[in-house]
Amino acid sequence: MTYELLNTIDAPAELRRLDRRQLGTLADELRAFVLESVAQTGGHLSSNLGTVELTIALHYVFNTPDDRIVWDVGHQSYPHKILTGRREQMATLRQLDGISGFPRRSESPYDTFGTAHSSTSISAALGMALGAKTQGENRVAIAVIGDGAMSAGMAFEAMNNAGVYRNLPLVVVLNDNDMSISPPVGALNRYLARLMSGQFYAATKKGVEKLLSVAPPVLEFAKRFEEHAKGMLVPATMFEEFGFNYIGPIDGHDLESLVPTLQNIRQRALEGGRPQFLHVVTKKGQGYKLAEADPILYHGPGKFNPQEGIKPAARPAKVSYTQVFGQWLCDMAAADKRLVGITPAMREGSGMVEFEQRFPDRYYDVGIAEQHAVTFAGGLACEGLKPVVAIYSTFLQRGYDQLIHDVALQNLPVVFALDRAGLVGADGATHAGAYDMAYLRCIPNMMVMAPADENECRQLLSTAFAQDCPTAVRYPRGAGTGVVVQPTLEPLPVGKAEVRRASTAPAGQRVVILAFGSMVAPAAAAAERLDATVVNMRFVKPLDAACVLEMARTHDYVVTVEEGCVMGGAGSACLEALAAAGVATPVLQLGLPDRFVDHGDHAALLALCGLDANGILASIRERFAVQPRAVQPRVA
């Protein structure tokens, strides 16, 4: 497809010079460009296809970047990036040194607030609106939030706060596509679906049908109205009760409706009064039939042929850690009826699809509500159940107070299965699990484990489940090392490390590498070239202090390596043990640097951080006076 109109748009000011009748053509080109770009790079697709018209309308009506648009989560920001001067850079999307898959303030003045975790947009936009008002600046702040993100408490906290203000230039746009990543759950979504069934709606429905029947151009929207009219005719909706002026729902793909509605809303926002709330109905995957039919599959695909669609992948040689967790969860649930599984809206990503199918009465999807998920698990544990919370490492940060106060303080036996621990590749710093070892090991009663491979992941999950205290097992994204996963559910000894390789180096050259989790494999590769001892530490807490002390006393140099932040992490735990015992063996700590590591290929990022085998070896040689052993010649 040629992009004759799109190629003329490098900034929203150029978009605003178009005749409104040209916007439909632009939408077609923009949607095709999004599809073509994501097919070549991978990335988020169905959410972006669903926001093409909304994005065009927002930039057409509002004076961006002076008017501030905040995209909640940011999965849907690709059309925005394309219209704001980054069309050519889409070829670098989510790649090392390329543009981010999420809004970033450092990337463009049109990215007014960095997002990636959900439900933050209304809070940020409220701050911007009040900031503008305080400084006497005449501009509008717009939060664009999906119906899935609206289920989180933070969104309601912001709305509750915003509703008390008057003469506030704030607009909230609810992008209602009936999806988050997994289908949305909870009372809010049922409420939105139930509004159209009230008595007022029933009494007027026939009259509305007669009106629509004589207006053929809107018959298609009439069908959408029948499906999605969640409050159009119901007075005093929940959003009005929060103090907003509610408009909608309107068709989020109908530019003829979107543009004048947004123009009216902008005018009202600038004139003062209550904050404005626009409810638009969109369809994830709009315009690409395969994504419309399966928006979850096309939520975040890798590279694919858009003519053929995503093909079923060949069975990989190595299972992923997520798959190992999912299988363990089902096996343990079959063995112990006390097990219940909890996810904050990440059923597919956390590997819980089979568990939900086999044990629907023991599966709880609480929506995008990490704080609630943690305390909810604590409540289940109080009644003698054994909750397993499947959550990404980065998202557990959102439930930290609940983890301390509601679970650990009461020493409740909740298992936290932390997926995406360490660097996560293309999703970048916002999704990296860089801090869990540091923020978990300082909590009393908490046990923290880091498996070296997929078989050990299963073993440590069983170990965690067997405890009468809160536990966490952290494991990385993607495929394991290729070891055979044994079907056993037997736990490992608590707090015991494993020596994987013993050094034969002479005195003065003896190095021990204390490796945690995913770093055992590259540490072992480096150790072969250095003739170093390698210890698979397994437990961040309780640390095998006896092993650490023995290794420090029998080696000349100690190296700790972890795929997590150095400050306060697992290496710090080793240093604390050595300091407490008065052991002064030189120590080198390796881990993630004191900066946010950007997006890119996972292997490239590890190399950039010096956490591949070459980097580990180079750091050891630079710090200590040791030499790699001579490579033995091959025997023919």
From Swiss-Prot:
Pathway: Metabolic intermediate biosynthesis; 1-deoxy-D-xylulose 5-phosphate biosynthesis; 1-deoxy-D-xylulose 5-phosphate from D-glyceraldehyde 3-phosphate and pyruvate: step 1/1
Record-annotated membrane-spanning stretches: none
Binding site for thiamine diphosphate: 75, 116-118, 148-149, 177, 288, 370
Cofactors that this protein relies on: Mg(2+); thiamine diphosphate
Keyword Lipoprotein on entry: no
GO molecular function, one term: magnesium ion binding
GO annotations of cellular component type: cytosol
SMART domains per UniProt: Transket_pyr
EC number: 2.2.1.7
Binding-site residues for Mg(2+), renumbered to this chain: 147, 177
Entry's cofactor comment: Binds 1 Mg(2+) ion per subunit. Binds 1 thiamine pyrophosphate per subunit.
Keyword Plastid: no
GO biological process, one term: terpenoid biosynthetic process
Function field: Catalyzes the acyloin condensation reaction between C atoms 2 and 3 of pyruvate and glyceraldehyde 3-phosphate to yield 1-deoxy-D-xylulose-5-phosphate (DXP).
Family: Belongs to the transketolase family. DXPS subfamily.
Subunit structure: Homodimer.
Protein name, entry field: 1-deoxy-D-xylulose-5-phosphate synthase
Species name: Ralstonia nicotianae (strain ATCC BAA-1114 / GMI1000) (Ralstonia solanacearum)
Gene: dxs
